Amino acid sequence: MNPEQIKTALGSGLLSFPVTHFDAEGRFAADSYREHVEWLAGYKAPVLFAAGGTGEFFSLKPDEIPTIVAAAKEVAGETAIVSGCGYGTEIAVDIARSVEKVGADGILLLPHYLIDAPQEGLYAHIKKVCQSVGIGVMVYNRDNSVLQADTLARLCDECPNLVGFKDGTGDIGLVRQITAKMGDRLMYLGGMPTAELFAEAYLGAGFTTYSSAVFNFVPGLANEFYAALRAGERATCERILVDFFYPFMAIRNRAKGYAVSAVKAGVRLQGFNAGPVRAPLKDLTNEEIGMLEALIGTHKRKA
């Protein structure tokens, strides 16, 4: 896909980012990963993010990432595959070029590694990554990489392939300023942990879609919530929040890192051999797995 095509795809429905499957020794498990991605693509996700945050990008070696992206592309069908990208500028450029070579339809540029940086430094970092590839780029505003509206506008002027802005700050004032300034130059994606909890607020700020973590294991329910959100059916949204998302949030909040670990546990409970999370994350306890299994309930995948 060219940048404009991936921009259009991003805005055409609910998005998600598959967990990365590992075997018992912690190596990438390509067969079970492909099975899972193929299942998710069947729920009409227009774009899936391979090796993203929920895909444990932070624990992957750079040379594992194109292998994961290629595996996703093999089975995704009409679903576009966007790759995670990040770390320092030179590593990010290498990752971006490597995934472009294996067919990635775009990259999601996650925050750079560790250090805080001024706006001019963020500008230089993102510009260099964007200009290193021809595919579309989405920037992820969160943690130590928070672009202000003027910086983002400069990047849009310099980088035609910068087509998406994903927010994980929760700063509605900032994101509303950005949507007002940039208009339809970018596609806007919600990126808070368990994004459904914030979806109504972000919709009001001009974010028409988001990446759903729970789509990994209850894609039908995730689609139901998204359809109700876009149709303005607030009573349906509230019912699903109360029945599923708030109890899921309670499990997620029991330990740091469970925003990833709980999703991976859900994938295993749906019959996929997703394997454990990599350190420094930890898997759910048996008690917590039981809580999650009860919550999945009638949304269990049919064998």
UniProtKB/Swiss-Prot annotation:
SMART domains: DHDPS. Disulfide bonds: none annotated. PANTHER family: 5-DEHYDRO-4-DEOXYGLUCARATE DEHYDRATASE 2-RELATED, DIHYDRODIPICOLINATE SYNTHASE. This is Probable 5-dehydro-4-deoxyglucarate dehydratase. Belongs to the DapA family. HAMAP family: KDGDH (MF_00694). The keyword Plastid does not apply. It comes from Agrobacterium fabrum (strain C58 / ATCC 33970) (Agrobacterium tumefaciens (strain C58)).
